[in-house]
From Swiss-Prot:
Name of this chain's protein: Multidrug resistance protein MdtC
UniProt cross-references to InterPro entries, sorted A to Z: AcrB_DN_DC_subdom, Acrflvin-R, Multidrug-R_MdtC
Source species taxonomy: Bacteria, Pseudomonadati, Pseudomonadota, Gammaproteobacteria, Enterobacterales
Keywords recorded for this protein, A-Z: Cell inner membrane, Cell membrane, Membrane, Transmembrane, Transmembrane helix, Transport
Pfam hit, one: ACR_tran
Gene (UniProt): mdtC
Organism: Salmonella typhi
Length: 1026
């Protein structure tokens, strides 16, 4: 009583406290960063290593395996995967959430150093690492085009100057430059000219390497001067290499230009990048795992004027893709939804109270509670994101509830002609416990979420804390500011003797009278109501089992990623043509704004595309509808497939897959994996629940197997090392020397001129110089036959792995897809040597599915404990919790009606309903218990009177919560796919709960009261006279 009086009788202090809360909130709002979702990125580090010319199997066994054994010892590694292709190995390390990325990077570097002695000696450089997830979509793509500069020169400028500058911006984790490679001097050998001159490829290589050296020469000095010695020991251009003498034949000099074409070109000619229809260099920028995407993009944009100033006029720099506009638009939509929710809630209060002064009180309490929450969000290190702002939108209906309960009770005393200050004090005292019970039990719902681990727990933590803080501030405001404003602003008035004169009052009275009549009938037919109650419990169970489920709603971010997978024997020239064809088909779609892509590198038969769609206001279709339309057109392209998927704000795992979800096969036996993977992939492709089924196992590439005749080689004076060196020199794009320049280092690359290596007959032109100096054709000691070979070798841990990726057809949920895959694996009878499991997002979905029921039960149990402590009763909490089944039925039926799967967002809605719908029961039970204690009423009379007296605040609070959530259901535009499931769940649950709990709660109250009396009679002992 004294606590409430302290604020009611000191209005200045109370107002200043509320103003302080508001000002802190405004300051926090201005300082809060902006993000699409809470920070949920796993720390990921990518290790790269190269050995030009090495086969995928060689890379896997000699490079990947030693590194994996060393990296696998690092603490906190959640998953380690590797992919080895021609001349390249990439290892992805995904760490636990709590692992610091910088500490992990130090451990990775130490592990690389420890494995260095086990790696092949011919590697051009040590393995390197990057603190970025290669499977993440770039946050920004910049393109460089030029009419006069070559692609190699553009690439050099991009990688040497632009990429280095951008990488220094806060938040940038990796700048991947694609579309070409660094400039190089390429030496294209003529096998016939070499044979005629008797010059071996090794001799050419050694001559070039010896002629281009960079060594210190020292200095000369006397007593006065010092002269540094400088020589022309370096060759920098193709023109300088052409006259190089590599051999003497009968006293005549054989120059490099006599046996080879020497050109200024690039290190790897098998690379191509495009933007729309132009050749381009792409700078694909990815953020650090812990970085904020908006702040990083803003930092890059702020740097762009400086970058453009340093770019020559012949180069055009453009932003091809930027993830931030749709994120900003989505957050703006949420902010507008929040404003609409506040307005609707205040409108509901006004319609019920029919007083401007009375409405002003909750109209002040709501913004104070919501704005004050921003200060706590800032102190907790949160961000303004879709989930935290949705929490505030939903909180609108909650925070007004507390003010309504206090205000409505004070207004009742004022109608009884009590003085305003006395009415404020008395009314607040009467419902203070009720308000505290409602708020604490609502906050208790979110305690299990705070203890939930993994990605779902990290994702939901900001939502739970934000909503809990808003409710906590609302509780303080409703018990301090609200009664103070009531006491000083409202006046005593006569009871409304003729409320029918006003429309809302007339409707409310009619509803109350109708409710009273129907409630009497229900209390006389309690068994029927009991059957209905049990039916809702059973229906809950059936609906939860039957409803389709998914992890997270599919987002329309306005960005698509595409992975091209062509025939495994395709040439680079043909693959470049496929890229151009696919880009033209996509560019012609009316919903597409921009398209960029690249192909080449270590995987000739694959490519990547990034598509930016027009803003939502300029296109009618969703991203998924655009994909469905393009899928039909793209299927007509022979010899290659393009798999499209919408970029999501949540991407789990480090695998670069051509679809959104993955199923990984593991085996310690590579032959068993290669035998069963095609069978499993074929069976999964036939499932109607899956689309775009593809695999990263590519073991049907064309290979030419050379079989050495070792006896013949020994007789001819040739060893295997010389033969292998011949092949590497001829066909491996071998980097044989380094050209040092002030800004970068460039390579001299040697191979047989492409004119002489167009088919297998090129092998017949190869020869080795034996120990006697004679040219021995390769065909003298080797035979060759075509065979199949892997284009890549993949590992997970230290096991051979193959990942089958898939998308979901429109109308199919992730739960339906995973169930279909599990059934198929059982039907196929896959042996125990091959193990299958979901990975990435699908894996997290299964883990979440296993914990959902536990989470819901834990929330109910927590609420029961809190209510039990507050009421000092085992029974009354059960009465209050009896409101939950009807809310669950309403929520699940609403999701079914809107064809929305049960996702993590819908789970949040269920958790919220646990907190919302019990408020009705709390108000009923509190007044019934008080009526029994002080009024001497029977339980039947007490609960009946409580239902009628609390009918108006129950209707007000429920409608306030319902209208607070309604904008989420009706919202469109960017990010609506996240907001709608939450709104649908809450609105459906509230409607059904309101219809049923007004009748089931009094029946359950009476049931437990009779049960209590029965047990008390059984346990009572007769008085024994002594």
């Amino acid at each position: 009583m004294r606590f409430f009086a302290l604020f009611i009788y000191r209005p200045v202090a109370t107002i200043l406290i509320a103003a302080a809360i508001t000002l802190c909130g405004i300051l926090g709002f201005r300082l809060l960063p902006v993000a699409p979702l809470p920070q949920v990125d796993f720390p990921v580090i990518m290790v790269s290593a190269s050995l030009p010319g090495a086969s995928p199997e060689t890379m896997a066994s000699s490079v990947a395996t030693p590194l994996e054994r060393s990296l696998g010892r690092i603490a906190g590694v959640n998953e380690m995967t590797s992919s080895s292709s021609l001349g390249s190995t990439r290892i992805i390390l995904e760490f636990n959430f709590d692992r610091d990325i910088n500490g992990a990077a130090r451990d990775v570097q130490a592990a690389i150093n420890a494995a260095q002695s086990l790696l092949p000696g011919g590697m051009p450089s040590r393995p390197t690492y990057r603190k970025a997830n290669p499977s993440d979509a770039p946050i920004m793509i910049l393109t460089l085009t030029s009419e006069s500069w070559s692609q190699g020169k553009l690439y050099d400028f991009a990688s040497t100057q632009l990429a280095q500058t951008i990488a220094q911006i806060d938040g940038v984790g990796d700048v991947d430059v694609g579309g070409s490679s660094l400039p190089a001097v390429r030496v294209g050998l003529n096998p016939q000219a070499l044979f005629n001159q008797g010059v071996s490829l090794d001799e050419v290589r050694e001559a070039i390497d010896s002629a281009n050296v960079r060594r210190p020469q020292g200095a000369i000095e006397d007593s006065v001067h010092r002269w540094q010695i400088q020589t022309n020991d370096e060759l920098k251009t193709a023109a300088e290499y052409q006259p190089l003498i590599i051999h003497y034949n009968n006293g005549a000099a054989v120059r490099l230009g006599d046996v080879a074409s020497v050109t200024d070109s690039v290190q790897d000619v098998r690379n191509a990048g495009m933007t729309n229809a132009k050749p381009a260099i792409l700078l694909m920028i990815r953020k650090l795992p812990e970085a904020n995407i908006i702040q990083t993009v803003d930092g890059i944009r702020a740097k762009l004027p400086e970058l453009r100033a340093m770019i020559p006029a012949a180069i055009d720099l453009q932003i091809a893709q930027d993830r931030s506009p749709t994120i900003r638009a989505s957050l703006q939509e949420v902010e507008e939804t929040l404003a609409i929710s506040v307005a609707l809630v205040i409108l509901v209060v006004f319609l019920f109270l029919r007083s401007g002064r009375a409405t002003l009180i909750p109209a002040v309490a709501v913004p104070v509670s919501l704005i004050g929450t921003f200060a706590a969000m800032y102190l907790c290190g949160f961000s303004l994101n879709n989930l935290s702002l949705m929490a505030l939108t939903i909180a609108t209906g909650f925070v007004v509830d507390d003010a309504i309960v206090v205000l409505e009770n004070i207004a009742r005393h004022l109608e009884a002609r009590m003085k305003p200050l006395q009415a404020a004090l008395q009314g607040t005292r009467e419902v203070g416990f009720t308000v505290i019970s409602m708020s604490l039990s609502l906050v208790a719902v979110f305690l299990p979420l705070l203890l939930m681990g993994g990605l779902p727990g990290r994702l939901l933590r900001e939502f739970a804390v934000t909503l809990s803080v808003a409710i906590g501030i609302s509780l303080v405001v409703s018990l301090t500011l609200t009664p103070m404003m009531c006491g000083w602003m409202l006046k005593s008035s006569k009871p409304r003797t003729q409320p029918r004169k006003r429309g809302v009052g007339r409707l409310l009275v009619a509803l109350q009278q109708g409710y009273g009549t129907s409630l009497k009938w229900v209390l006389n037919h309690t068994r029927l109501v009991g059957v209905v109650f049990l039916g809702t419990v059973a229906l809950n169970i059936w609906l939860y089992i039957a409803i389709p489920k998914t992890f997270f709603p599919e987002q329309d971010t306005g960005v698509l990623m595409g992975g091209i997978q062509a025939d495994q024997s395709i040439s680079f020239q043909a693959m470049r043509g496929k890229l151009q064809d696919f880009m033209k088909i996509i560019r012609d779609d009316p919903a597409v704004n921009n398209v960029t892509g690249f192909t080449g590198g270590s995987r000739v038969n694959s490519g990547m595309m990034f598509i930016t769609l027009k803003p939502r206001g300029e296109r009618k279709e969703t991203a998924q509808q655009v994909i469905d339309r393009l899928r039909v057109k793209l299927a007509k392209e022979p010899g290659a497939k393009l798999f499209l998927m919408a970029v999501q704000d949540i991407r789990v795992g480090g695998r670069q897959a051509n679809a959104s979800y993955q199923y990984t096969l593991l085996s310690d036996s590579l032959p068993a994996l290669r035998e069963w993977e095609p069978k499993i992939r074929k069976a999964l492709s036939a499932l109607p629940q899956l689309a775009d089924v593809n695999s990263d196992q590519q073991d049907n590439g064309a290979e030419m197997n050379l079989i050495y005749d070792r006896d013949t080689m020994s007789r001819l004076g040739i060893d295997v090392q010389a033969a292998n060196s011949l092949l590497n020199n001829a066909f491996g794009q071998r980097q044989i020397s380094t050209i040092y320049q002030p800004m970068n280092q460039y390579k001299v690359v040697m191979e047989v001129d492409p004119r002489y290596s167009q088919d297998i007959s090129a092998l017949e032109k190869m020869f080795v110089i034996n120990r006697d100096g004679k040219a021995i054709p390769l065909s003298y000691f080797a035979q060759w036959r075509p065979a199949n070979a892997p284009l890549s070798v993949n590992h997970q841990g230290l096991s051979a792995a193959s990942t089958i990726a898939f998308n979901l057809p429109t109308g199919t949920s992730l739960s339906q897809a995973t169930e279909a895959i599990d059934r198929t694996m059982t039907q196929l009878g896959v042996p125990s040597t091959v193990r299958g499991s979901f990975s990435g997002t699908a894996q997290v979905f299964q883990q979440t599915m296993n914990s959902q029921l536990i989470l819901i039960v834990a929330a109910i149990a927590t609420v029961y404990i809190v209510l039990g402590i507050l009421y000092e009763s085992y029974v009354h909490p059960l009465t209050i919790l009896s409101t939950l089944p009807s809310a669950g039925v309403g929520a699940l039926l609403a999701l079914e009606l809107f064809n929305a799967p049960f996702s993590l967002i819908a789970l949040i809605g269920i958790m919220l309903l646990i907190g919302i719908v019990k408020k009705n029961a709390i108000m009923m039970v509190d007044f019934a218990l008080e009526a029994q204690r002080s009024g001497g009423l029977t339980p039947e009379q007490a609960i009946f009177q409580a239902c009628l007296l609390r009918f108006r605040p129950i209707m007000m609070t429920t409608l306030a919560a319902l209208f607070g959530a309604l904008p989420l259901v009706l919202s469109g535009g960017d990010g609506s796919e996240l907001r709608q499931p939450l709104g649908i769940t809450i609105v459906g649950g509230l409607v059904m709960s309101q219809l049923l709990t007004l009748y089931t709660t009094p029946v359950v109250y009476l049931f437990f009261d009779r049960l209590r009396l029965r047990f008390s009679r059984k346990n009572s002992k007769p008085v024994v006279e002594i």
